[in-house]
Amino acid sequence: MTSKKLVNSVAGCADDALAGLVACNPSLQLLQGHRVALRSDLDSLKGRVALLSGGGSGHEPAHAGFIGKGMLTGVIAGAVFTSPAVGSILAAIRAVAQAGTVGTLLIVKNYTGDRLNFGLAREQARAEGIPVEMVVVGDDSAFTVLKKAGRRGLCGTVLIHKVAGALAEAGVGLEEITNRVSVVAKAMGTLGVSLSSCSVPGSRPTFELSADEVELGLGIHGEAGVLRIKMATADEIVAHMLNHMTDSSNVSHVPVQSGSSVVLMVNNLGGLSYLELGIIADAAVRFLEGRGVKIARALVGTFMSALEMPGVSLTLLLVDEPLLKLIDAETTAAAWPNVAKVSVTGRKRSRAAPAEPPEAPDATAAGGATSKQMVRVLERVCTTLLGLEDQLNALDRAAGDGDCGTTHSRAARAIQGWLKESPPPASPAQLLSKLSLLLLEKMGGSSGALYGLFLTAAAQPLKAKTDLAAWSAAMDAGLEAMQKYGKAAPGDRTMLDSLWAAGQELQAWKSPGANLLPVLTKALLENAEAAAEATKNMEAGAGRASYISSARLDQPDPGAVAAAAILRAILEVLQSQGA
């Protein structure tokens, strides 16, 4: 079965992609009759060296994303994973020569088709009297023994674009640029890993992987790698990659050792999430610095992809200060990252958080008995939420993410850990404030924010008094804050529905009289739980569920169910203690 792609046609997808890039970038223009993109200011290059690169499409943003001042002059693109036509390469060489450039350097990845086609175009151009040189980049560190075809050209090619571009912008001649980038190309290596393959438009995936396998040392055309290893943590996979790349017994290794200075590239092969990319980058930095390697610059993003392949490649380039200045040189290329020109290693990566303000004395602080009662209440709430994790997750799946139970369990475990560390504050106001901060930090998601808002606001009326009227006012304040910032109202199918129903029952506490808790408990719980159950017949008016068709929402809202369960746990403990 072929994979789905958002294209107009399989045959025209490479042309359409290049046209889209040029349409949105005024600094680029197409060469009529060819799949070639050039700088739109070619006339400004008179007397300088032109830089041309390219290859098959499907590696975006490479290579056309790196056209610009300080990088490439132009790019010749082939069909997906197919070398560009000789005629188009020659047309690009002629175009930059006619603009008054003093020579052209072809930067070519080491693949047979690219070498042949760029090489043939070079020979034809030279026969016409155009000075043209060619550098073939092979930075693949996958193979431990030398292959006749040499090392494949991978993401390190982009660094060659950058170095050559900086030299050309500085007015360096063709021969010197060729010699210098040839040296640089030998001082780097790249290794890729992927969780699965990719698929050319109109075709099936290029290879199959088991659910517990990853492919190591693969190229950028969907071809299989050199080794399949078992799925592991990001740290373990990164360690495997970097150990392989720097192993001196590997003929294609990068000779990195303690004290070396490197540029690190963490390259998304197309389908990896940026969350995963950040985790990989962190693992790579920690691994290298743990070996005493200085990371002069770290470039993280998508530089050379393989369509939608969910994988990553790591590139290491050994650098000194002169080379680093070329990496840092200004460029207008759209796909080059605008990173700070400072070393990654040795930089302070965190700063102390502001100190919490001292707590004001609380006149409502109660005795030890009340504190123990609060512990029992919180313990029951935690046990209740942990027991509901699977049920709440199941209810939440209708809204898309299915993590309501997990979120509430995370809150419960955070509270349990907090209770083990120290007894809770005796003051109700301070207790609610502390719980608010804890949930905001540990619970996460909109639920954590809403509970945090509720508890922060509810704490305010309890600073002066803790009688029944104050607790009713606290409930009102919490509900008001949730409505103000959460933009929810009763009837919107949220946790507010359960809490609102309970709040209406608590209005009776504002009237003078005896302890009404035993009388209220049954009615309060019945109303709160009925309100939670009623949410299954409501159309969501707030929260993530509001974006889901009401036809799919035929179960109670998980937040409302959780809130009702919390109320039951609280009131049952208080009633059992005779509060």
Curated annotation (Swiss-Prot):
InterPro entries: DhaK_ATP, DhaK_dom, DhaL_dom, DhaL_dom_sf, Dihydroxyacetone_Kinase. Pfam families: Dak1, Dak2. Optimum temperature is 60 degrees Celsius. Manganese or cobalt are requested for FAD-AMP lyase activity. Dihydroxyacetone binds at residues 56-59, 109, 114. GO terms for molecular function: ATP binding; FAD-AMP lyase (cyclizing) activity; glycerone kinase activity; metal ion binding; triokinase activity. It comes from the Eukaryota. Residues 372-572 form the DhaL domain. The modification Phosphoserine is found at residues 350, 511, 546. Its EC number is 2.7.1.28, 2.7.1.29, 4.6.1.15. Detected in kidney (at protein level). Coiled coil: none annotated. Optimum pH is 7. It catalyses: dihydroxyacetone + ATP = dihydroxyacetone phosphate + ADP + H(+); D-glyceraldehyde + ATP = D-glyceraldehyde 3-phosphate + ADP + H(+); FAD = riboflavin cyclic-4',5'-phosphate + AMP + H(+). Keywords: ATP-binding, Cobalt, FAD, Flavoprotein, Kinase, Lyase, Magnesium, Manganese, Metal-binding, Multifunctional enzyme, Nucleotide-binding, Phosphoprotein, Transferase. The active site is at 221 (tele-hemiaminal-histidine intermediate). GO terms for biological process: glycerol catabolic process; negative regulation of MDA-5 signaling pathway. ATP binds at residues 401-404, 446-447, 486, 494-495, 557-559. Belongs to the dihydroxyacetone kinase (DAK) family. Homodimer. Interacts with IFIH1 (via the CARD domains), the interaction is inhibited by viral infection. This is Triokinase/FMN cyclase. It comes from Sus scrofa (Pig).
